[in-house]
Amino acid sequence: MQTYQAPNGKPYRGWQAVFEDAQPLPWTAFNTGYISGALQNNAQPESFPSHRDPTERYNYAVMAFHFRHPTHGDILIDTGFDRTFHEHPPYGNLSFAMRVYYTLTKVQCIQSNGDIDLGSYLKRHQITPAHVFLTHLHADHTAGLPALPSQTHIYYGKQEWALMSRLLCGNHFAGKSSIHLLDMSTGGALAPFSHVVDLFGDGTLWAISTPGHTRDHLAYLINTTPTPILIVGDAELTSWAMQDEILVSTVDGARGKEQVQRSANMIRSFHATYPDVQIWFSHDEDHL
């Protein structure tokens, strides 16, 4: 486990300048299953509009994203579910702690189709990922890691690997030999975001600090043509939740709630300023 040092890149002064250097990067967003649970399990009830029932159940997609870089090869953003969620429903390869939590909160994982898991998707499209960038260390984002080769390079925020994360992720990282920590405090500001890192130094992939849901949650921008895409992970729950100004959950108390609000404000400001950039979510098959 080591801290990743991003190469020095071009000194961009704003996102418009970044977008002017966009490259054609083939990419896909794909769903690996669903999480079925009440809205109040995933968001702050005090932020719900009157037409949203906190106890209403939704099936939330468990998304992963793939793109191909001209020199760094195939890259994933998050991993979704592996095949165990179809073979051993409803909790697949989740840790004991996650099974207890999901049982108490009446949450279930659904993968009714046996070929939508991460491994099946990669095999079907003949993809061997060289790199995986994680938005955060929650099990529904790391549960596909066992389907990947041990030498796959894995990246996530430096402050994520706390005891809680280890309990939630269980054995998802078992055997993985190349883990890199992203120190977002070294990143500069590109308004409206306070800390961003040009990960490859060529303007193609950016990590963006969006803490709150977890302490070092990250969003990622893929600078592709004709339209860049911003993957916000769980900093925003879904497209409709963002439109309703619903705030995601946090286990970090008042500090976490303040960070969730600040991160949501930055994402919503970015969307208002750059409406042509597609906003993608970890739990929605639709984008804004």
Segments predicted by a language model, with ranges:
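Active-site metal-binding loops of divalent metal-dependent hydrolases
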Residues: 32-33, 79-81, 137, 212-214, ...
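Hydrophobic/aromatic beta-strand patches that form the interior of the parallel beta-sheet core
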Residues: 28-30, 75, 133, 155, ...
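Metallo-beta-lactamase
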Residues: 1-140, 147, 153-209, 227-233, 255-275
